[in-house]
Every structure is written in structure tokens, then in C-alpha cells.
């Protein structure tokens, strides 16, 4: 989300519309204006289902994936935090936090296989990080506690990272069969909740930067968002 694109209009009645993650975050007028962060499979995990036949795609992850991106006064990204609450996936289950900052990438969780899979195959390919440097993630083994509530917000902490979101502005459903990651189209459905307030602490210090808010009163958008009831198929 350092520079942004405008997405195609997309909603439940047009599930095949192409989706741009970055445009989703920025555009509140379209249902896709959500800042979606979720896990999707790399090409190697997509199975034999053709990109053009969503009916043959199989679930690869079920869970929740809130996200937070902060910006400085010039609009540059100062931090990107991807919180994962994975109920089931092809690489296991558990809670993970992936933190991107200009000085490197930190992954926190109890299962390095799951944490590094999420970081290397998915987060690094998200358009939010287009044009930003990506380094080999540093894995920090630690329990991650996640409390997500579509009524009130999020608290996630572990491995020196503490993320809070509050003031849920909206709750809306989203679905598409055309969400590309690493050159492979995926199907995605979820419930999205943009948040009006958020902050991140890293090793006890408040992470610099502010969230970006936009959209319309009917469809607000924010770079701090909840994403629940999330299912990815590939």
C-alpha cells in the first residue's frame, strides 16, 4: 500500500471480478475496498484444478487474517502486520504474526513450518508490499494470542509484537473467484470489518505511522481491518 491502484468493481453478484488487494484497501465505494489479507496457496499447493474452473478448487485455508498497515506523512509504509488465526490449512493450524518493516521481516508462532509458509509464499506476494524490499524472514518461536471480535476489534500479541484495533466501522461479506497470488488465481470468501483506530507495539515501542482511512460513509475503508470467516480455495 505504498502506492495504490483502483480495483475493478466486485461483489457477491459478480464473484468473478478481478481483485486488487491494494485497490481493495483504498476503495471504500466498492465492496472489494477492504484491505484483504489472507493466506492463499502458492502454485505448488494449488493442486490440479484449472484456474478457469473454480468449482474444482479445494479449500487450502480456513480461519481469520486481520491486517494493519501504517504510513508516514509522505505516504510511505512504515510497517505491515499480518495476523493469522488458522483453524485449518494444508500446512497446519495455529496463530502467527508476520511483521514487515524496512529493516526486515519477523515471523512469530509456535510452528515454523506454518509461519514461514505464510510469510514466504503469501505475505511477500501481497500487493501491499509491491516495490518494498523483502528479506528472509526471521522466525521467533513464541505463543501468539489472538482475540478477534467483529463487534469490538482485535488484540494480538506474541514475540514482542502487540497489535490492537478498535472502532469497527462496518461489517460486510466479500467473495471472488479471481484473487491472484503468485500468478495463481484463488477463490476467497470472508467477512470484513474496517477499523477506525489501531496501533502496534514492537519490542515495547509504539510503531511510527498512521492508518489510512477512506471510502464513503456507507462503505468505509481502512488499512486496519478485521477479516473473519475466511476460506481460501485453490
Tell where the protein language model's regions lie, with residue ranges:
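Targeting-peptide/extracellular-domain and disordered-appendage signature
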Residues: 2-15, 24-35, 46-234
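N-terminal signal peptide c-region/cleavage motif recognized by signal peptidases
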Residues: 40-41
